[in-house]
Amino acid sequence: MQRANIILLSLILMGYLAESALLATAGCILLVMRLSKLNRLMFLLERRGLEVGLIFLMLSVLVPLAHDNIVYKELVMKTLSPQGLLALIGGTLATHMNGEGLKLLKLDPQLIFGMVIGSLIGIVFLGGIPIGPLMAAGLTALFLEVIYWFK
């Protein structure tokens, strides 16, 4: 059995044991694609999968805004509340960190392996959700920046 198949089966098993349907499903889909020799689709997924995933994530978050039953005055009040202002700051910092992570991944793409392993550890042991490598890369960029400050 090829090494990639063993790794994918391991991911499926880890997803099952950790009760992470996302990890198990992703492993299953990749294994089926691999066994079906859908290399072109895998290449497309590798190149554009993150963008497509982020589009669906953004859509799921923005759906409430598309409903007609939103009271915009309440929306503004919530946004200007202390929690809303913290959410604005959090969103601003998160997108900045994601941008820094993307720069880091372009400079040193080999770091993705450590981020994937770290994500798996977070899923299995901390009950985390694999939202994408950009946040992991952004945090890595922040950690590296802090280390450089102390050198």
UniProtKB/Swiss-Prot annotation:
This is UPF0756 membrane protein Dred_1097. It is a multi-pass membrane protein. The keyword Protein biosynthesis does not apply. PANTHER family: UPF0756 MEMBRANE PROTEIN YEAL. The keyword Signal does not apply. Keywords: Cell membrane, Membrane, Transmembrane, Transmembrane helix. Belongs to the UPF0756 family. It comes from the Bacteria. It comes from Desulforamulus reducens (strain ATCC BAA-1160 / DSM 100696 / MI-1) (Desulfotomaculum reducens). The lineage of its organism: Bacteria, Bacillati, Bacillota, Clostridia, Eubacteriales. It holds the Pfam family DUF441. It is found in: Cell membrane. Signal peptide: none annotated. The chain crosses the membrane at residues 6-26, 52-72, 75-95, 111-131. GO terms for cellular component: plasma membrane.
